[in-house]
Amino acid sequence: MVKKEAELCSKLNKWWITTGYKVLPVSNYCIEAKVSYTRLFNFKSGFKEHQLPTLEAYNTKPMKWKISDLDQISTKHYDMSWTNPVTTKALVAIQWVRRGNKTFYLIEPEAITNVIAQGVKSLTEECAKLIAIYIGQL
């Protein structure tokens, strides 16, 4: 995770506690945070090969992982996590980095996959507005 993605995660966490849980449907959310430094968010360099398929899997089948896999990153609060596609929603949060911009877009990974399948190589902020399920301010 790059520094700006880490900053976006921190801001999204604050947004979730103050606003997000009130405006989004009741669910557990898995969020992949992405930032773009230019007008275009390039899909090939912006996503690792496994990220979109994994996020889509959260929306379609039960998932599990051992928290001990994350021991090197931070203190763990429990040992395992299980998700159910009925109660879990995976989303991509994208923010374009520029002075004063506080807007972020929550987009379903399936929508991004559909855009890629149409031959689009990069996402503009205008396109993000069209496919986002939620547009928020940090």
Language-model-derived ranges and their functions:
Residues 10, 14, 57, 129, ...:
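Charged/polar, solvent-exposed surface patches and flexible loops
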Residues 36-61:
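Mg2+/Mn2+-dependent nuclease catalytic core
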Residues 22-39:
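Conserved catalytic cores of phosphodiester-cleaving nucleases, focusing on short active-site segments
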Residues 56-111:
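Nucleic-acid nuclease catalytic cores
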Residues 5-6, 96-138:
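Helix-rich interaction surfaces within compact, conserved domain-sized segments
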